[in-house]
Amino acid sequence: MVYRKPPDGGWGWVIVIVSFFTQFLCYGSPLAVGVLYLEWLDAFGEGKGKTAWVGSLANGIGLLASPVCSICVSSFGARPVAIFSGFMVAGGLMMSSFAPNIYFLYLSYGIVVGLGCGLLYNATVTITCQYFDKRRGLALGLISTGSSVGLFIYAALQRELIELYGLDGCLLIVGALSLNILACGSLMRPLESSDSPSPEKACTDKVPDQYFVYHEKEKTVEENISILEKGYIDEKCANNVPDYKQDNILNKNVLSSINVDEKDTYKKKVVEQTNFCKQLAKRKWQLYLNYWEETVVLFKNRVFSALFFAILLFDIGGFPPSLLMEDIARSANINEEDYHMPLVSIIGIMTAIGKLILGILADFKWVNTLYLYVLTLLMMGAALLAIPFARSYFTLAVLSGILGFLTGNWSIFPYVTTKTVGIEKLTHAYGILMFFAGLGNSLGPPIVGWFYDWTQEYDTAFYFSGFCVLLGGFLLLLAALPCWNACTDRSSKLPPNTYSYKVASSA
């Protein structure tokens, strides 16, 4: 479908508002799952690594399934997908209140809620991009803060609901709140299509009829013969021809000749259609090969390969604090009276601020977004290494704010990817990177939890997390150094026989 020119306003601002609240409602509980994590530890008595899988699946599976989610939005539209996904998120949260064990939560909270969030994310981004062109960056920045504000509010809300109604009541109420996604989704009116024919229809109109296996008006050979035979006999009976036997023989001869001709024509069409199917399959296979060739070309890019490792290591090491910070405070024996605000809420509000400030910095011409992203990775690695030394609420609150602000580097990640591979390859490269970002989100919290189960302390776990993020930052920094490009340019400009020529001349 061909959409008319994006209005950059009008109903588009309604789309921004409902997309903001959609991300607020769907991501609020999964991002603030650290509050629920403590209750699940007490309720089921499982290890921290096994319990952490619930939150990591809810936040990671949406990224892992992002290609499938994109196909669903492209096929059915943003509004139907948003409404359906609203039922998924609400149903998954409500089902989780009846969970008899941790494995049930893997399905209800981890997979169902996680997939619903992934579908909603793609729906909100797609419909926003359809309505905005010149102001697309501003619109996407506004809707992306919905998840961060949701993290800030839901952390305190879920804690209060648990104290009033228990864990099961909290999940039921949060699930009921998520039903408001249906109202938001119903307002995602698709952009009106233009009157001009779509490119797909224009292309298919030019294809000859013989290339369609089943033409609308085409009948089989047997049907054609039966129609001809019936029409010929009716005509002879109407004219009262006496020589029925002779005409019957003539009729059979005519029909046999028609039968042979139509069979030959049918065979030719079958051959043509078979060749067309072979060509179509060959073309699809060629597209598949081209995709993998382009993927290989992407990984030959030194900076892209480093960015691939950086985003994977960043999510393995940088995501666990938002899930485990509350348990870290409890393990440090910090009194609940000292809690002025949940640590997860601090992470959430600072993430929203970080997204806005880093996004503004990325728009300045004198700022290199790649080096800015590297700086956030190195600073986050240092902050993670400092967590084992924090023994008070104030220190953990400061570190939570720093980590939340630096996590806002998600807002500049598309800029970094574009700068690395170019706008032509952005979709392909960004899809690969998001898949492995989801893998890191899924693996990070369980790994940190297993470290705690092994050592009975979080110190080793966060030394590991800090090392992962620092390693990713240093790899990206080394790959992005301009000296590599200078060496490459110098070697490409040198003639192949320069060295032997100099030796011969000196001799």
UniProtKB/Swiss-Prot annotation:
Catalytic activity: creatine(in) = creatine(out); (R)-carnitine(in) = (R)-carnitine(out)
Pfam families assigned: MFS_1
Annotated TM spans: 13-33, 53-73, 80-100, 103-123, 137-157, 164-184, 303-323, 341-361, 370-390, 396-416, 431-451, 461-481
Sorted UniProt keywords: Cell membrane, Membrane, Transmembrane, Transmembrane helix
Top-level division of the source organism's lineage: Eukaryota
Cellular-component GO terms for this entry: plasma membrane
Cytoplasmic side: 34-52, 101-102, 158-163, 324-340, 391-395, 452-460
Topology class, membrane: Multi-pass membrane protein
Extracellular side: 1-12, 74-79, 124-136, 185-302, 362-369, 417-430, 482-507
GO biological process: carboxylic acid transmembrane transport; carnitine transmembrane transport; creatine transmembrane transport
Listed GO MF terms: carnitine transmembrane transporter activity; creatine transmembrane transporter activity; monocarboxylic acid transmembrane transporter activity
Localization, UniProt: Cell membrane
Family label: Belongs to the major facilitator superfamily. Monocarboxylate porter (TC 2.A.1.13) family.
Role, per record: Extracellular pH-and Na(+)-sensitive low-affinity creatine transporter. Also functions as a pH-independent carnitine efflux transporter.
Protein name: Monocarboxylate transporter 9
Organism: Gallus gallus
Protein's gene: SLC16A9
